[in-house]
Amino acid sequence: MINVEIIRNYDKWREHKQINKALIKKVTQNVLLRFDNFSKIKQFELSILLTNTAEILTLNKQFRNIDKATNVLSFPSNKLNWQDLCFSNVSPKLELLIGYDYMHLGDIAFCYEVIYNESYEQQKTSENHFIHLLIHSILHLIGFDHQNDTEANIMENLEIEILSYFGIASPY
């Protein structure tokens, strides 16, 4: 089971009824089911903040020391590594988690204005762009990153595969 908590700090998000707990749960489940190590954990929790430029700018400054608004920020609750998920049956890090019935994945903050503007510029629906960013962020929460070309290719290929499940074309 996946429990999703959503805080909408910006009224424009309320216009997008399709961005809701059911969608977020469905996307999260689709990502997690790709990794056998998560199958033993019975309950996951994910916190979502739907906010605006001012708040995302503050968060980006505070946590990344970057004075610029961004589309999404991910804050993992656990120090996981994609290699542990992909290349081992049960890594020592994951072994600790598997003994528990519950795992808080982390927090994700989405910025309405940046996502809306990117959607317009890239000629895609804001919902499809949101789904892509959600997939990207969940992958960050479970240890994926794009610090080099190899990591970026692995992460992008996973995103493309998951997006195709939702009928969304590759953004790359």
Swiss-Prot record:
Q: Which Gene3D superfamilies match?
A: Metalloproteases ('zincins'), catalytic domain
Question: One MF term from GO for this chain?
Answer: metalloendopeptidase activity
PROSITE patterns listed in its UniProt record: UPF0054
Question: According to the record, how does the cofactor bind?
Answer: Binds 1 zinc ion.
Top-tier EC class: hydrolase
Q: Which residues form a coiled coil?
A: none
PANTHER family, per the entry = ENDORIBONUCLEASE YBEY, CHLOROPLASTIC
Q: What is this protein called?
A: Endoribonuclease YbeY
